[in-house]
Amino acid sequence: MAFSKLLEQAGGVGLFQTLQVLTFILPCLMIPSQMLLENFSAAIPGHRCWTHMLDNGSAVSTNMTPKALLTISIPPGPNQGPHQCRRFRQPQWQLLDPNATATSWSEADTEPCVDGWVYDRSVFTSTIVAKWDLVCSSQGLKPLSQSIFMSGILVGSFIWGLLSYRFGRKPMLSWCCLQLAVAGTSTIFAPTFVIYCGLRFVAAFGMAGIFLSSLTLMVEWTTTSRRAVTMTVVGCAFSAGQAALGGLAFALRDWRTLQLAASVPFFAISLISWWLPESARWLIIKGKPDQALQELRKVARINGHKEAKNLTIEVLMSSVKEEVASAKEPRSVLDLFCVPVLRWRSCAMLVVNFSLLISYYGLVFDLQSLGRDIFLLQALFGAVDFLGRATTALLLSFLGRRTIQAGSQAMAGLAILANMLVPQDLQTLRVVFAVLGKGCFGISLTCLTIYKAELFPTPVRMTADGILHTVGRLGAMMGPLILMSRQALPLLPPLLYGVISIASSLVVLFFLPETQGLPLPDTIQDLESQKSTAAQGNRQEAVTVESTSL
């Protein structure tokens, strides 16, 4: 716990922490545009088969209306509109008869869209669906693109967690911003869908490093009393980015322009990130006290605290001798499951991360199916997410981490299950429940960011965060895939999302400790001390209750 006292000597909360938060707000505003980009860049426009009589101008009869030509060229689809995936082999002139019925033609009279499709460009001038014809028999390639993107975050979460502990938080953050910028910009030049997916994977790989490095740097430079507020502010920036995406996509209807707008800012963010100091906690753990002292003095100078000039290497080493000793002990992924005090919380957090992201991404990637203006709906989702996260700091001050985490996940699950009972024609009420669930997920994700950092000590914090992100991204990959079962079992996806969310809230209640008001643990011994203190407190409370009753 000694580093917490050293951080207080460097000012605790001041100008540096404010500038740091403002710096991290920039990527948090832009990351949602990358993650949720395909709600718009891969939106499915209205489409039908290309036909000679309708779309070959020289073959169109001048005495027939476009509606009549459509009637004899395209069969009706399931929703009574023009079929999106089939056309008549030959013009069905008999359908012009007002008395014609569905029996006037048969399936044998139709064929697939062998000459391609005609797309409605009234909403989007261009999408990747229209560019590579990801419709009809190829419609499964659209969710594949999102799954590949999520797999990039999955792999990156594991790799960057290990690399950040080995090489430091700061260089990984700058590199990942540059990687995302280059890969994201390059996608507009992709000649094939395969190359596009590969570049999206590389961009997502870098995004995972931005998540891990930025959040860890922020947590490790923030005092215990301000940690919840700081993380909530950053979470609100993420929500604002979601809302802004709706406006950005409304203004930029071409997928290439939208992709550039979401990628180019990361070039600037990569340069800006170099002013940030390296984590002094990490430098201490890695046996680099001289550099740690320099960073602490730098922060103190920015905060205007002259007392830190008296901080010497001897005082630093004396204060953090437990951390230095801990750094000499070999740590690996196995420590999360072999060390008794870490085992239960590691397993429980794996379950919580996995289940939370299954339900969350199943909801946010299903935007177009709500049947409303997706630009407005995206902005609405971001706004309610902002409100949910903004209230998190206040809620955490009174109710604690465990209560908020469990309660918000349970409420989100109940909102999803309630939506199952609402008829399809009551779209407004369905949107209300969806927005309520999104807001609860916003609270849950903000709380989880703080909670998991407080559950693990410094030597394994990045490794744990990397593993949790990896498992969470497995859930994120599963969320959209579950939606594919809707064609056979329409109620299965929301049922799974709701039940999984409620079940994970019970895991939080029964298997995770409360960390409210506790200093950030620097060693495994700190966790043991917290556990012993909590046990003594429980025994004392039991004695007090018994004495009162007597």
UniProtKB/Swiss-Prot annotation:
The keyword Glycoprotein applies. N-glycosylated. Contains several complex-type N-glycans. Changing N99Q: No visible effect on N-glycosylation. Loss of N-glycosylation and of cell surface expression. Keywords: Anion exchange, Antiport, Cell membrane, Glycoprotein, Ion transport, Membrane, Transmembrane, Transmembrane helix, Transport. The chain crosses the membrane at residues 11-31, 143-163, 175-195, 201-221, 232-252, 257-277, 347-367, 379-399, 403-423, 431-451, 464-484, 491-511. Changing H305A: Reduced cell surface expression and estrone 3-sulfate transport. One of its GO terms (biological process) is urate metabolic process. One of its GO terms (molecular function) is solute:inorganic anion antiporter activity. It catalyses: estrone 3-sulfate(out) + glutarate(in) = estrone 3-sulfate(in) + glutarate(out); dehydroepiandrosterone 3-sulfate(out) = dehydroepiandrosterone 3-sulfate(in); prostaglandin F2alpha(out) = prostaglandin F2alpha(in); prostaglandin E2(out) = prostaglandin E2(in). Belongs to the major facilitator (TC 2.A.1) superfamily. Organic cation transporter (TC 2.A.1.19) family. The keyword Transmembrane applies. This is Solute carrier family 22 member 11. It is found in: Cell membrane; Apical cell membrane; Basal cell membrane. Antiporter that mediates the transport of conjugated steroids and other specific organic anions at the basal membrane of syncytiotrophoblast and at the apical membrane of proximal tubule epithelial cells, in exchange for anionic compounds. May be responsible for placental absorption of fetal-derived steroid sulfates such as estrone sulfate (E1S) and the steroid hormone precursor dehydroepiandrosterone sulfate (DHEA-S), as well as clearing waste products and xenobiotics from the fetus. Maybe also be involved in placental urate homeostasis. One of its GO terms (cellular component) is external side of plasma membrane. Residues 531-550 are annotated as: Disordered. Changing N63Q: No visible effect on N-glycosylation. Loss of N-glycosylation and of cell surface expression.
